[in-house]
Amino acid sequence: MTEVISNKITAKDGATSLKDIDDKRWVWISDPETAFTKAWIKEDLPDKKYVVRYNNSRDEKIVGEDEIDPVNPAKFDRVNDMAELTYLNEPAVTYNLEQRYLSDQIYTYSGLFLVAVNPYCGLPIYTKDIIQLYKDKTQERKLPHVFAIADLAYNNLLENKENQSILVTGESGAGKTENTKRIIQYLAAIASSTTVGSSQVEEQIIKTNPVLESFGNARTVRNNNSSRFGKFIKVEFSLSGEISNAAIEWYLLEKSRVVHQNEFERNYHVFYQLLSGADTALKNKLLLTDNCNDYRYLKDSVHIIDGVDDKEEFKTLLAAFKTLGFDDKENFDLFNILSIILHMGNIDVGADRSGIARLLNPDEIDKLCHLLGVSPELFSQNLVRPRIKAGHEWVISARSQTQVISSIEALAKAIYERNFGWLVKRLNTSLNHSNAQSYFIGILDIAGFEIFEKNSFEQLCINYTNEKLQQFFNHHMFVLEQEEYMKEEIVWDFIDFGHDLQPTIDLIEKANPIGILSCLDEECVMPKATDATFTSKLDALWRNKSLKYKPFKFADQGFILTHYAADVPYSTEGWLEKNTDPLNENVAKLLAQSTNKHVATLFSDYQETETKTVRGRTKKGLFRTVAQRHKEQLNQLMNQFNSTQPHFIRCIVPNEEKKMHTFNRPLVLGQLRCNGVLEGIRITRAGFPNRLPFNDFRVRYEIMAHLPTGTYVESRRASVMILEELKIDEASYRIGVSKIFFKAGVLAELEERRVATLQRLMTMLQTRIRGFLQRKIFQKRLKDIQAIKLLQANLQVYNEFRTFPWAKLFFNLRPLLSSTQNDKQLKKRDAEIIELKYELKKQQNSKSEVERDLVETNNSLTAVENLLTTERAIALDKEEILRRTQERLANIEDSFSETKQQNENLQRESASLKQINNELESELLEKTSKVETLLSEQNELKEKLSLEEKDLLDTKGELESLRENNATVLSEKAEFNEQCKSLQETIVTKDAELDKLTKYISDYKTEIQEMRLTNQKMNEKSIQQEGSLSESLKRVKKLERENSTLISDVSILKQQKEELSVLKGVQELTINNLEEKVNYLEADVKQLPKLKKELESLNDKDQLYQLQATKNKELEAKVKECLNNIKSLTKELENKEEKCQNLSDASLKYIELQEIHENLLLKVSDLENYKKKYEGLQLDLEGLKDVDTNFQELSKKHRDLTFNHESLLRQSASYKEKLSLASSENKDLSNKVSSLTKQVNELSPKASKVPELERKITNLMHEYSQLGKTFEDEKRKALIASRDNEELRSLKSELESKRKLEVEYQKVLEEVKTTRSLRSEVTLLRNKVADHESIRSKLSEVEMKLVDTRKELNSALDSCKKREAEIHRLKEHRPSGKENNIPAVKTTEPVLKNIPQRKTIFDLQQRNANQALYENLKRDYDRLNLEKHNLEKQVNELKGAEVSPQPTGQSLQHVNLAHAIELKALKDQINSEKAKMFSVQVQYEKREQELQKRIASLEKVNKDSLIDVRALRDRIASLEDELRAA
């Protein structure tokens, strides 16, 4: 390491070594406080380690080779370009910037871009002398300065005829705005012209800075003059290099600052400048005071900034307004808006006891409305109790206190933002002076990267913009540069600097997968969406899927995003409101009608939406969120940058305390790392930043070489010959395919040599020209001498000739001859001059017109291009949404087909399992018969066993001992309960269940044979019978416990199924919401083919109705069979109880207990089967009623089949969801089969006896029946859900039809208005032709006809009222009385037929009455459905009250009696409820048919009314013709 450092220090590029000055070897080492510090190597250690001593200290430290960096020689201190440093490392770059900063040299070159450090003080480096200095110097001799970058951009624009851009970037408080001002100052100075108009443009461009700073800048924690908006200033230049125009584009105004400011910050400067600098007259006119504490939006902020006089700044603002051409009215309008905002913040809002808001200070409202130019009453009403549209009606909504306060704040922010936009537009109007073709230099000044204690939506947009700008810088500096090296095929190794910011940008803006802004836009249009739902949705999308995204500790409060500068925590509170930018439309419309023209102009878009209506509807534009608008503006800005040659200025914050001559090394080093400064220096030193095409290089520098003149030399070869002749080092340039690439500084050296060559050549040229001119002067003098001599000779001859008489005559006549010819020539020339002037003027006018047309076409073209880009962006968004929905639809259809196939397989399996179940039931019946034969045999043994009564007492003692052993059995029960809980997690599949049942049947047969053998042995061995009795009692108790546990397990499974059904409903809702979007997009395309499918679905539903009817009858028969079985079971239980009382023998008691146990099991299983069948019967009845109602509604709404297709799609989706759930249940069943078989194998040694096997068989059969029934129930629920969705779609279609009828009704009303206007014309005609009696008679006849039609209409209305009364009577009476009222309803139908066919305009009232009657009938229909639902609910409650008793094992006789009593009561209740249900169903069907007939008749009446309207139009037209004829 010693040799390496010494070599680096002594031999690098021939640099002067530190040893020439100092014998110490100086290095940089890291320091926790100052980032790095100087030290010198005291001793070399083995393993490449060193002992170093700190500078100005005796502290020593052992460091490794990787922990030190060499220090540059002293001659490189405060170097102008950091690319010239010998050792390029982070401490060296930071130290160079620090040394220059402390010596007030705030600008430093960093390769191809400029680094500017904020001095936090004024420096005399922007004067006119400095501007002239940089204007006169060549590029190589220019010291680092912002003027140098501006001059480079200007020269490139003139030489290359290419648009330029200067990106001033950096963190907040780094001095971006100040550097932007200096760039504009320099461009205005060097591009100035002698003409008055051009100088005025330059002055106006400079004066825009104080205006924009006053209205758009504010004090923040890090900057006293922070730009709270982004601006892109385009300075346009003519072809001659003079400033012709300027334009300003603005982005992301922080309008929330108007109403809220953080601690130690303040509002926009203009508020404080107005209160401090305005005179008394203006304040009185604006109703303002001098104190900032009088206004709520200012009193909590910092009022004064050190070193800034708001009063003087206000004078500067007024002077800028005057220079920019603002008149007094425009100035007053701007200040009036500021006063409006201040008064708006002083409105006090309270609430009454009911929570409704009320305004507490009417005086402040009067002031505000006076400034706004609106009525105080209307303003207060629209603010506190606005009118909102609920459906098709306008209602008054009472607002709460918080709603009114937020509405006021939103209005204040909107007014300030709109006023700022108007101000920028007005500035652009003042700066637009020429329409000629030009190039521009764009200067970007936008808010820097921001990290506050609480970062919201505004900070995300600002940081997203800076992320894009930083990516553009990295792409231009590192990627494009090296890509061009590769494209030109020069020798270069690609360097990856690791600055790929695309993952963070994709996380913010990408549409698929959905990013932050797209997710926010989706949540803004979702109903009942909140900030918490947005955050949770975003967390579900990106958690653990992107390294750039991290959740908050509390996930619903925000998230953390990794930017290029740092990790930023964002709080999502209020993001939905900020993105939608809500505004009280009632107040906005009121302001659009304001008497204050400026206020009305700001809200002119609400005035346009009020006037542009079509058929009574407001025509609104496409809704765009704040995120969408910002993303579009940012994309347009980046497109402009990509079409220009960029120049970069990286601004650096030296300290966070805003102190001069204070340099925080860790802070600056972090910014250098983030901004890519070090990488830019490295690529500048290693690469070839300057390049020229071969032809340009030859044209520019061939003057310095001697190329062959006789033959043609190709440009590439000529360029190489020039470089060889100029003796340029080959390592300093590379020859590409079409260009020559140079190291930094080489092209500047060539330029200097070219200038020297030109100077030498120009000197030679000057000498030759001067010699030529002197020779010309000498020759002229010789000619003058010869002319003088000739004149002298001629004068002598003239003197002699003058005395000759004829000569006098000749001299007198000669002028007279030539004057006449001269006059003619002069007149001819004057005429030609006049004609030429006329033609010139004509051509100038035509030229101006062409230029004007060209400007208009260019403006229209730019407008069309902007519109096209926005439309393309919208189309891309819609295409992306459509593509996602199509992909989801395709996936849904695929899964639907799979689940459909699985459902068919399940149905086949369920059929086979049902058959197996029937076989098992038959075998069980055979078993019961065999048991009865055994009982008969055991009755014969009663006499033989009478002698063993004494032994019974001993067995009772054994029973008591068995009770003591019950504790041990309970432990076994706990183990069995745990096993049952494990069985609850999975459900038995149908295929595995078949194998298991067959296995149990075979085991059961063997056990029956063993039971027979044990019964035979029972007579021989009484001692063994006593032991078996004790064992049987244990088993009975154990089985009873197992029965109770299994019943509890069944209840738990039911609860789990209910929870699954709830989850299914939630999933169905989400799927329905997604499918609605797909259906709305495809509804217009698939209308015609859907009609056929809908008709087929109607036929299928009719068939389904018939199948349900037959199934209903079958279920009723099964119910009867179950009741008969219950009766037989109760009789058998009574018989067994008598036998149990007569038993005095242990063996007989064992047999009776076994029989009772079997009967109890059968009874429980029968009860469960009966309940399931009864529930299935109820579901079938409900399904039949739903099918009937749906069938009738669909037949009635046959004209709206297109809307029903969407319900069918939802039905298929829900059915698919059910099938997928069934498939998941199928998988769970298969898992349970495996677990059950495993458990059975484990329990087989314990359950080797007959009772245990019987109990398990019955339990398994019971579970099988439950599973089959649950599967059927799920299918029925799926059908019911599909029908409910279908009903929902039908109701939506009815709503659409009602809306269409309302539209037609509005049309008819318009026609009525036209007829009324015709009547007025008729009255005028009567006055004019009053003498004609025939017209009067005709009019009287028409009036008589109108009276007749009114009478007819009244009679029709009376009939409608009678119908309504009958309908109310139907609702009030019970079902028995409803049948008697049916004929009365039918008798009213001929009344409609008896109405005369002659119709008038008043038939419209009849049509409205019919419509009302139709709605009343619909309400009655819904009420009947509610009654039906209540009856069904009562039946379900009765059913739920039936709780089957559980045997305890202590008193079997009481349990059997209780079961018999409950079964009997249950039987009576079921019969009564069944009778009620059948009667209600019959009455419901009759009543439903009557209502449908009435609805059909009303529809006919509506059709007739439409026909009558058309006839009425024809009659009106005929009357008009008659009147015209008269």
Curated annotation (Swiss-Prot):
Gene3D superfamilies: 1.10.10.820, 1.20.5.4820, 1.20.58.530, Kinesin motor domain, Myosin S1 fragment, N-terminal, Myosin VI head, motor domain, U50 subdomain
Domain Myosin N-terminal SH3-like stretches: 22-73
All residue ranges annotated as the Myosin motor domain in the record: 77-755
One function term, GO molecular function aspect: ATP hydrolysis activity
Actin-binding: region residues: 634-656, 734-748
Coiled coil: 875-1244
Keywords: Actin-binding, ATP-binding, Calmodulin-binding, Coiled coil, Motor protein, Myosin, Nucleotide-binding, Phosphoprotein
Keyword Metal-binding in record: no
Pfam families from the UniProt entry: Myosin_head, Myosin_N
Any Gene Ontology CC annotation: mitotic actomyosin contractile ring
GO biological process, alphabetically ordered: mitotic actomyosin contractile ring assembly; mitotic actomyosin contractile ring contraction; mitotic cytokinesis
Residues bearing the modification Phosphoserine: 1044
Classification via InterPro entries: Kinesin_motor_dom_sf, Myosin_head_motor_dom-like, Myosin_N, Myosin_S1_N, P-loop_NTPase
SUPFAM superfamilies: P-loop containing nucleoside triphosphate hydrolases
Binding site for ATP: 170-177
Domain IQ: 758-787
PANTHER family documented for this protein: MYOSIN (PTHR13140), MYOSIN-11 (PTHR13140:SF857)
Subunit structure comment from the entry: Binds to cdc4 and rlc1.
Protein function: Required for cell division. It is a component of the cdc12 'spot', a structure thought to mark the site of septation. May work in conjunction with myo3.
UniProt record similarity statement: Belongs to the TRAFAC class myosin-kinesin ATPase superfamily. Myosin family.
The protein's name in its UniProt record: Myosin type-2 heavy chain 1
Gene designation per UniProt: myo2
